[in-house]
Amino acid sequence: MEKKKVVLAYSGGLDTSVAIKWLQEKNYDVIALCLDLGEGEDLEFVKEKALSVGAIKSYMIDVQEEFMNEYALVALQGHTLYEGKYPLVSALSRPLIAKKLVEIAELEGASAVAHGCTGKGNDQVRFEVSIQALNPYLEVIAPVREWKWSREEEIAYAKENDVPIPINLDSPFSIDQNLWGRSNECGILEDPWAAPPEDAYEMTVPLENTPDQPEFVEIGFEEGVPTTLNGTTYSLSQLMKTLNSLAGKHGIGRIDHVENRLVGIKSREVYECPAAMTLLTAHKELEDLTLVKEVAHFKPMMEQKLTELIYNGLWFSPLKQALVAFLQETQKTVSGTVRVKLFKGHAIVEGRKSEYSLYDENLATYTVNDEFNHDAAVGFISLFGLPTKVYSQVNQKKVEA
């Protein structure tokens, strides 16, 4: 019987390494796919590990710029904070991973793709809905969801099949990381009353160890895209790496969140997003300076829906695409520079400027330079308040009657 091909999203961890052997037993030739999203790991080692475990081919693709320009940038310009706190770290990378799975499957003539998600998380939905949107004819296999093993049973299977056991297997945490941030769950974090231990963090310094003097950074934007840091031009991925280091040193971007998962349960996770939270703060302030009132007031309603769509795995949905088109239109004047103070866990905007600034000092000032037409206020107030005045007059007549 001829073997079928399957492309597996491979991380190098226990689950996806065991999945290679498990898929082979199901008569599949496994092609491993590992993406460099800026997590800082030795991915060449991961690529070779897949081959040593039994994959017939192994890809390692650097997608850092694509991730930042086509995925994280949407989150930045859309101010996507799920439930007001979570900047969508993992949710942003899943549609890109799904896209690459489909591309490699089509390139290799594979009939299926596979991922290492469990049956109780959000990621299984994000992967599979995205894959269905991109190629509805591909079979999707979820080995971890299907085999239903305990951790002990999985380790026993790995030992029986000569699958290398990761040296960090004793770590209680489940971690996912990319340039936009780092998420951490499991272990003691499953108790919402327990304080996260310091070893749950990696990108940020605890407040008591942060510098006692603030650091100032100037972030330059062009049409909503951060392009410079302290006057130096960077690619988006390099800017993120530099700012992650700067903001992380000051303890910025730690988030402890109990969130409502798509699958109906609550989960407690700890996030670190030093650069993301700094950029989100700066970008919002620049929008406040450059967007007209109607757009500035309407945009948050769109942002909430966009956030939910991305969190729920609907990146490739028609509504999400339409919302992004609106988003891009709003960014045409969001150019300028924002000065941010980094200090003791806070990113505080202390200055902003733009050639598209709608702030007119001569209209806003209370000095002798005031150019505002105060006489116009009388007629404006009369017309603006007319509906309320008429309503009051009508109802007072009824009371008197």
Curated annotation (Swiss-Prot):
Keywords: Amino-acid biosynthesis, Arginine biosynthesis, ATP-binding, Cytoplasm, Ligase, Nucleotide-binding. GO terms for cellular component: cytoplasm. Gene3D superfamilies: Argininosuccinate synthetase, chain A, domain 2, HUPs, Single helix bin. GO terms for biological process: argininosuccinate metabolic process; L-arginine biosynthetic process; urea cycle. It catalyses: L-citrulline + L-aspartate + ATP = 2-(N(omega)-L-arginino)succinate + AMP + diphosphate + H(+). Pfam families: Arginosuc_syn_C, Arginosuc_synth. Pathway: Amino-acid biosynthesis; L-arginine biosynthesis; L-arginine from L-ornithine and carbamoyl phosphate: step 2/3. Its EC number is 6.3.4.5. ATP binds at residues 9-17, 116. L-citrulline binds at residues 86, 122, 126, 174, 183, 259, 271. It comes from the Bacteria. L-aspartate binds at residues 118, 122-123. It is found in: Cytoplasm. GO terms for molecular function: argininosuccinate synthase activity; ATP binding. The keyword Heme does not apply. InterPro entries: Arginosuc_syn_C, Arginosuc_syn_N, Arginosuc_synth, Arginosuc_synth_CS, Arginosuc_synth_type_1_subfam, AS_cat/multimer_dom_body, Rossmann-like_a/b/a_fold. PANTHER family: ARGININOSUCCINATE SYNTHASE. Belongs to the argininosuccinate synthase family. Type 1 subfamily. Homotetramer. This is Argininosuccinate synthase. It comes from Bacillus cytotoxicus (strain DSM 22905 / CIP 110041 / 391-98 / NVH 391-98).
